[in-house]
Structures are given as structure tokens and as C-alpha cells.
Amino acid sequence: MPHVEMLLLAVAALWVCVRGQEPGRKAVADRYAVYWNSTNPRFQQGDYHIDVCINDYLDVFCPHYEDSVPEDKTERYVLYMVNFDGYSSCDHISKGFKRWECNRPHSPNGPLKFSEKFQLFTPFSLGFEFRPGREYFYISSAIPDNGRRSCLKLKVFVRPANSCMKTIGVHDRVFDVNDKVENSLEPADDTVRESAEPSRGENAAQTPRIPIRLLATLLFLLAMLLIL
């Protein structure tokens, strides 16, 4: 019976090693807060972008106002995920699909918040699956009462797995990207720009790998247990 227990312990150790080698896996998920309104200076600069890792989150906060602000002075947006052409031309009609709608500027519970998890796989039929090393694009378009068209847009680059350092911790870390310095990792010229369509079943993930020395050590211990 002790041999069986030790065998199960060795198998469990191997399973932990495999889980730890999943691409882009981190002990702590980073959350990036984006305040979606025309007064955000990052949108005014015209090159609003963030770099994320798999399993990180994007939190979009809609415009919010006090009750004393008239409706015609508030901002409302419909946000779309688009491809690169839609991002460049700010065209959501034929280049993307609707993601969220900021339509409650006087919400009594504070600003509306929408979250996007950059995950490899999604259980939802209309969910979106993200791939490391690719760019994704969000835009919104609103037409104020004066007829002037405004466009806010955001570019998200999903870092390759080897550039996402593993961290230790149990709580999500929150970044306000409006105050954050410029990202240190820029997409390379051959970065793949993802099409703006929900992913369904495209499960082309990398195969987890275990370090050779660790695997050999565990196999040796397992053999010794069987001999005893």
C-alpha cells in the first residue's frame, strides 16, 4: 500500500509540472483599466495601445456624470472589435462587430464597466479567443449633436508566451494605463493582425513541455520506489 501512495504522489508531481508549463500561464493576472471618453489624453494622442499577456484582463470604464449634467452634455459610445483596416479607417460597419455599449452615463451605481479576458480558449459560442504575438483592435464611434464625427480607438498586443514572466501571488494586479508609461515591448514588423471575428474551436495551443532534468529525476525516483 505505501508503494501505491508514493506512486500516486509521483504522478501528482508530474501533473503539477505539466500545469506549470502551460504557455503564458501566470500566478497573477494583470488588469488594465481604460477610461473610454474623449477627455482621456491617451486617446487624444492618437496611439493608445497596451501590451498584455494571456489570462490578463482589459477593464473598460464608460463615461459617467453627476445627475446635474444634462443628457446632451454626456458621451455615449458603442464599442466594436475590428480588424486592422477598420482600426485605421475607424470603420466599424463592414470591418468588425459590436462588443459593448456605453449607454448609461447617469448610472446610479457608478460607471459601466466591461471586461475582456485575453484567453486562449472560451466556452462561449460568441466568445473571442486570443493568440500570443497578435494584435487586436477596438474602436468606438459617436456623432454629437453638432454633427462632428469622433472616433476613439485602442490597439492591444498580446505578448508572446516567452516574454510573459511568471509571477508569484494570489491577487490580481491593477494598472491604470492612463497613467502608465509607454510600453517597453513594441510589436515586431511581422506581428500578426487578427481578424475581428469570434473564434470558435481554433485550438492551436502549444504543447506543454517539462524540463528534461526534472522529468529524469522524477522517473528515477519512481523506479526506485518500484524496486523497494
Swiss-Prot record:
Membrane-topology annotation of the record: Lipid-anchor; GPI-anchor
Location(s) in or outside the cell: Cell membrane
Protein name: Ephrin-A5
UniProt xrefs under CDD domains: Ephrin-A_Ectodomain
Lipid-anchored residues (GPI-anchor amidated asparagine): N203
Keyword Phosphoprotein: no
A single Gene Ontology CC term: plasma membrane
GO-annotated molecular function: chemorepellent activity; ephrin receptor binding
Propeptide boundaries: 204-228
Keywords, in A-Z order: Cell membrane, Developmental protein, Differentiation, Disulfide bond, Glycoprotein, GPI-anchor, Lipoprotein, Membrane, Neurogenesis, Signal
Disulfide bond annotation, renumbered to this chain: C62-C102, C90-C151
GN (gene name): EFNA5
Tree of life domain: Eukaryota
InterPro entries xref list: Cupredoxin, Ephrin, Ephrin-A_Ecto, Ephrin_CS, Ephrin_RBD
Organism of origin: Gallus gallus
